[in-house]
Amino acid sequence: MKTPKMNVESFNLDHTKVKAPYVRVADRKKGANGDVIVKYDVRFKQPNQDHMDMPSLHSLEHLVAEIIRNHASYVVDWSPMGCQTGFYLTVLNHDNYTEILEVLEKTMQDVLKAKEVPASNEKQCGWAANHTLEGAQNLARTFLDKRAEWSEVGV
């Protein structure tokens, strides 16, 4: 049975054929004024086989969202996938895949050096009790350990 074409790019991805961890271009959009938005699928866990626990995912979201901007001014957003297997990295007017991998590598290395999860308090976070620095660092370490495989999506 053929799956119908969906509006959401990731719904058209055959999740049974990917090999996490990986980083792939999920979408490109060109604006009316020439701006280009590129969305990357940054997959940490194998779909339908493993997932990140919420406190670790939540903490890694905070850490990367804050730290990645030290390495790249063109970052628009770093947001978690609802399936808890990865994140989306959205950038503006920057379409250099190799550089994105380098920025992600530097960011994850900085996550390993972090002493606290940024903005993990009730004033700055909607679920402040749901954080673990150690869990986030374990995710970053595991992702970095497979750095040589990030370009191997498997599709």
Curated annotation (Swiss-Prot):
Residues annotated as binding Fe cation = 58, 62, 125
Query: What InterPro entries does this protein map onto?
Result: LuxS_sf (IPR037005), Metalloenz_LuxS/M16 (IPR011249), S-ribosylhomocysteinase (IPR003815)
Q: Does the keyword Transferase apply?
A: no
Cofactor remark from the record: Binds 1 Fe cation per subunit.
**Pfam families, alphabetically?**
LuxS
Q: Which UniProt keywords apply?
A: Autoinducer synthesis, Iron, Lyase, Metal-binding, Quorum sensing
From the record, what ranges are coiled-coil?
Answer: none
Molecular function in Gene Ontology: iron ion binding; S-ribosylhomocysteine lyase activity
Matching NCBIfam families, A to Z? Answer: PRK02260.1-4 (NF002604)
**Could you give the subunit structure recorded for this chain?**
Homodimer.
Q: What does this protein do?
A: Involved in the synthesis of autoinducer 2 (AI-2) which is secreted by bacteria and is used to communicate both the cell density and the metabolic potential of the environment. The regulation of gene expression in response to changes in cell density is called quorum sensing. Catalyzes the transformation of S-ribosylhomocysteine (RHC) to homocysteine (HC) and 4,5-dihydroxy-2,3-pentadione (DPD).
UniProt-recorded name of the protein: S-ribosylhomocysteine lyase
The gene name reads luxS
